[in-house]
């Protein structure tokens, strides 16, 4: 039974990746209509990448489930090792293009946490779509102990480093913690903002429109390192403001798609891509599938 449930959950993680790239139109992002602000990847690149990562999803679950009683730091290291192997498979499939590196990090943590949670909730092994809102929140909270050391390890001695990554520079200059910060705080954007928003939207509109509405909402609130990297702080703040206006406009499904298509043209011209938002959309969809919301 455990194997079947883990296979099912792994498929939901893959499904989340495929739904995200298929959702169209997405401003600045790769989708079925165009490559957004990217000239080195396409829709099929993302499909290849997702399929390359998929075999590792069950490994992440296994690590969390079978090592649930270990020190969380040790579980994290096990997940990190497998995550690096998955990343190498991704780069091999995409010929060196970084399609899913960030979201692979988050999926490793959340699938590992899902495995840990299932070890303490055996009744859920009977039916994969029996997860509740409380289960999703508990899984997000389990990431906290897994990543308790992460900010200190990665950001604690930056003053001693000669060369900094862009994420490290963002932390030093603006205090932006990026995916590490989101993980270390138990994915509050997912648990307390994205999922409640998506659940509410799904009660009043169709699945595709609800996902597009979620994309707009996330773009209006997320600290998106990809946007900042490409355009700077002001460009990111401008996109957030534009999306806040779109979010508050309550457009029909048809008008929303038209507005997103027009904004896609704008971001392509500015070479801006909200990749951080796309990652959080994937994670939101994963939990929506677990809860059988989608």
Curated annotation (Swiss-Prot):
Pfam families: CitG (PF01874)
Enzyme Commission number(s) of this protein: 2.4.2.52
Residue spans crossing the bilayer: none
GO terms, molecular function: ATP binding; triphosphoribosyl-dephospho-CoA synthase activity
Enzyme class: transferase
Domain of life the protein comes from: Bacteria
GO BP term, example: prosthetic group biosynthetic process
Keyword annotations of the record: ATP-binding, Nucleotide-binding, Transferase
Keyword Transferase annotated: yes
Reactions accelerated catalytically: 3'-dephospho-CoA + ATP = 2'-(5''-triphospho-alpha-D-ribosyl)-3'-dephospho-CoA + adenine
NCBIfam families tied to this protein: citrate_citG
Family: Belongs to the CitG/MdcB family.
Protein known as: Probable 2-(5''-triphosphoribosyl)-3'-dephosphocoenzyme-A synthase
Species of origin: Streptococcus equi subsp. zooepidemicus (strain MGCS10565)
């Amino acid at each position: 039974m455990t194997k079947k449930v883990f296979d099912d959950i792994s498929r939901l993680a893959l499904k989340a990746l495929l739904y995200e790239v298929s959702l169209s139109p997405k401003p600045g992002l790769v989708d079925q209509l165009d490559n957004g602000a990217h000239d080195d990847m396409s829709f099929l690149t993302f499909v290849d990448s997702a399929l390359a990562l998929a075999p590792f999803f069950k490994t992440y679950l296994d690590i969390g489930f079978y090592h649930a009683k270990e020190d969380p730091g040790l579980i994290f290291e096990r997940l990190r090792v497998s995550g690096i192997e998955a990343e190498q498979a991704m780069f091999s499939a995409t010929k060196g293009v970084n399609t899913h590196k960030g979201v692979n990090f988050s999926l490793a943590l959340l699938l590992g946490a899902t495995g840990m949670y299932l070890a303490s909730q055996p009744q859920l092994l009977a039916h994969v779509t029996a997860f509740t809102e409380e289960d999703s929140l508990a899984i997000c909270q389990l990431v906290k102990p897994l990543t308790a050391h992460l900010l200190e390890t990665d950001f604690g001695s930056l003053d001693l480093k000669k060369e900094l990554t862009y994420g490290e520079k963002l932390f030093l200059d603006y205090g932006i913690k990026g995916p590490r910060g989101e993980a270390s705080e138990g994915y509050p954007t997912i648990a307390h903002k994205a999922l409640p928003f998506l659940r509410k939207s799904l009660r009043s509109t169709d699945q595709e429109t609800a996902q597009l509405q979620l994309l707009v909402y996330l773009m209006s609130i997320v600290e998106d390192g990809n946007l900042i990297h490409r355009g700077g702080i002001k460009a990111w703040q401008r996109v957030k403001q534009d999306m806040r206006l779109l979010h508050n406009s309550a457009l029909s499904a048809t008008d929303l798609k038209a507005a997103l298509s027009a904004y896609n043209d704008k971001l392509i011209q500015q070479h801006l891509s909200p990749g951080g938002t796309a990652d959080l959309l994937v994670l939101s969809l994963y939990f929506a599938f677990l809860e059988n919301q989608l």
